[in-house]
């Protein structure tokens, strides 16, 4: 089995956040890999990884980083694959990481999700893959139908809650 999604984090300290992406992909049976690579500490390994990802069958890369958050941009500069950046919350509440990821120069785009929004990164990666993979598309559609059903149930439950001045 080849990974369709590659999850890269600057260090294993990002794993508690990125586990949400791993869990979503695993629950939806979308093959993925997880590695720690640092744009600052292992730049050659990052470049080698990024250049070889497409050849290994990877379709989308999710790159998580905090603080200066160079990792997503460095990867995007070295691969033709789409890169999704996940800013990790740190001392500046993730604002530093988010700005580092979204302020890329022309020609080196990085899609960006919210601070610590690893699950959204996994869903976005699956949606990108779903454009050309019907099996993944069906998994995404089924998952979205499931979350819609949860909201419908919540509204039915709320309809049963009684207050004197509640109008619905």
Model-derived regions, located:
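Glycine/small-residue-rich loop that forms an oxyanion/phosphate-binding "nest" at active or ligand-binding sites
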Residues: 78-102, 106
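C-terminal binding/interaction regions
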Residues: 3, 9-16, 20, 95-168
């Amino acid at each position: 089995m080849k990974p369709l999604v590659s999850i890269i984090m600057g260090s294993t300290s990002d794993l508690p956040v990125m586990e949400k992406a791993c869990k979503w992909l695993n629950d939806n049976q979308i093959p993925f890999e997880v590695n720690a690579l640092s744009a600052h500490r292992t730049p050659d390994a990052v470049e080698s990884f990024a250049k070889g990802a497409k050849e290994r069958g990877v379709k989308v890369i999710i790159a998580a980083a905090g603080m200066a958050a160079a990792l997503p941009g460095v990867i995007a500069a070295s691969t033709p694959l789409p890169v999704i950046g996940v800013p990790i919350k740190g001392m500046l509440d993730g604002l530093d990481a988010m700005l580092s990821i979204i302020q890329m120069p022309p020609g080196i785009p990085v899609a960006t999700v919210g601070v610590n929004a690893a699950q959204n990164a996994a869903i976005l990666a699956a949606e990108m893959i779903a454009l050309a993979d019907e099996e993944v598309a069906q998994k995404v559609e089924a998952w979205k139908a499931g979350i819609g059903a949860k909201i419908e149930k919540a509204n039915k439950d709320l309809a049963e809650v009684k207050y004197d001045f509640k109008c619905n």
